[in-house]
Amino acid sequence: MNAPDRLTTHNEFKNHDLVDDTGKPGVRYEKRPARRPDGSEAPGLYNAWITLDNPTQYNSYTTDMVKGVILAMRAASNARDVNCVVFTGAGDKAFCTGGNTKEYAEYYAGQPQEYRQYMRLFNDMVSSILACDKPVICRVNGMRIGGGQEIGMACDFSVSSDLARYGQAGPKHGSAPIGGATDFLPVAVGAERAMAACVLCEPFSAHKAYQMGILTDVVPALKVDGKFVANPLVETQRQFDEFGRNAYGEPKTGDALKEGKAMMARGSVDLSMLDARVEELCAKILLTFPDCTTKTLEELRKPKLEAWNRNKEDARAWLALNMMTEARSGFTAFNEGTKDDREIDFVLLRQKLAAGQSWVGPLHDEIQPKAKRAA
């Protein structure tokens, strides 16, 4: 039986993109051929790769880059020939380390209304990931820190190099991780682990991130003498220490750390296994009903979306006002400090606030790293 004419293929499509050009400095958008599980190409079908391309600043996103991600996610979502989205960073050092602290310190610090407008864009970037009609895979090629962790957790899947590190940075550098971390982490890992990650800002390994439940898979990325080896800086051979505490994924210490650093120096980074695992995941998604997959994504995103939509506008307002006080000082310290000294004098700040000193006046300068060095 022939299909009725009204169901025949359309030869001309409506264009649902807001703009025709997705290009913005620092963000690459490309469509790569989709492949079946056997490696053969699926003609006419693609995976959209969105790459944060600012490797000299660890793929931290500038204002223009935030715009670029929004446009790229929207384009990939609308593209009829796109199977899924791969969101990654350039190079092998970082997926993303969050907002560009140079831009924060030199333009947004002290300008709450400007930062409020910036945060509208940031919120739209996170929302564009959560609203994408295609599965979004975070290809974690290196550090996923601060805002980088937040946009990474907005994705549906995360496949990581085992050399990558994870964590938040807010309270250490003048902000609060309310661009997604305080929404997504409690959903994924529970209140206690979320509290420790967001308040203490201690980085953790990819193996620990996998164990916590915020990664789909972890693959080795270090080659030594031609063979892939697990990250030699973290414990991967035992689950517990002698006291029954978790040891897997924790940083090595003492002689074990020295040996691990020596192995790192002998090896080289190779992301081919990461790429193979990402392609494998894309191929598995290819062999699903597209509309059923989209509906499944929409349902599974609801816990994250409920928290995100409830809090994002309050977060935007608070972050803008915070640019007058702690954010101004924290981002300035990070931008102007040395590699090993990018934090304010936290104890001095607390002492001065306890004594009643106002942020209006010399407090900002007194707590900077350069003030500590001059003392």
Annotate each predicted stretch with a short phrase.
Residues S128-G147, I151-P290:
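Crotonase-fold acyl-CoA enzyme core
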Residues L121-M125, A181-F184, R193, K295, ...:
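Hydrophobic alpha-helical segments typical of transmembrane helices
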